[in-house]
A protein has these predicted regions:
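Short, conserved "active-site rim" segments that organize catalytic pockets and cofactor/ligand binding
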Residues: 1-70
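Short HxH-centered metal-ligating active-site micro-motif
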Residues: 53-104
């Protein structure tokens, strides 16, 4: 699998296919989203919200939760607000989350 990924990436870079994804580091919609890392949401969440590349900072973890007020999720949100101009934060869960019912 790694060889396939590396080969695809090589061709992607050589053909400059990345150019159509160019965006500022500052989110166009001044939006940050905290959501679950569930693979079903990879394309679904931005599509369901009408978001395009560069519109929002999307932070993902298991369950889309802030477990530690001094952890990496909170740090990412603080940087988004204080450095990257984010004005709106959405916390979005989903049905059938695998984290539901797990003990930490």
């Amino acid at each position: 699998m790694l060889e396939e990924i590396l080969q695809y990436n090589k061709e992607f870079v050589e053909s400059k296919a990345y150019e159509k994804y160019a965006a500022s580091k500052y989110p166009n919609k001044k939006l940050a989203i905290l959501s679950c890392m569930d693979t079903r949401l990879t394309e679904l969440l931005p599509a369901a919200l009408g978001l395009k590349n560069g519109d929002a900072k999307i932070i993902k973890n298991a369950g889309g939760i802030i477990a530690d007020p001094f952890g990496s999720v909170m740090r990412s949100l603080l940087i988004a607000v204080h450095t990257l101009g984010v004005e709106h934060i959405l916390v979005i869960g989903h049905t059938d989350c695998g984290v539901q019912g797990l003990d930490s």
